[in-house]
Design a protein with these regions (language model features):
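Arg/Lys-rich, low-complexity, intrinsically disordered basic segments
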Residues: 1-98
């Protein structure tokens, strides 16, 4: 099971960063915008998913080193970060450490 490390973003304007087992850093999420883990609004979540699904982002396991994957699954899947981390482990077999 691959282990990814979740940290504060290193890129200006981004919220979080994940570091892959190979050491690749991916910054994601707007530092100023709110996400599902903040507002827990199902309508905003549906709108975000609809808008970003048209962008051709890879939300499957093969996209695990992309910002879109992490934004979708950590910030827009469950009402809390802890629940999102559990979801990622169950769905993709990826362990996320904070």
């Amino acid at each position: 099971m691959p282990i990814y490390k979740l940290e504060p973003a290193t890129a200006k304007g981004k919220r979080y960063s994940v570091v892959s087992p190979e050491g690749k850093r991916t910054n994601f999420g707007s530092a100023t915008g709110s996400t599902f883990i903040d507002h827990k609004d199902e309508q905003k979540k549906a709108a975000w998913i609809a808008r970003h699904s048209k962008a051709g982002e890879n939300w499957e396991y093969s996209g695990r080193d992309t910002a879109g994957f992490w934004a979708r699954h950590l910030l827009w899947s469950a009402p809390t970060l802890r629940q999102s981390i559990k979801y990622i482990k169950e769905r993709f077999g990826i362990k996320v450490r904070t």
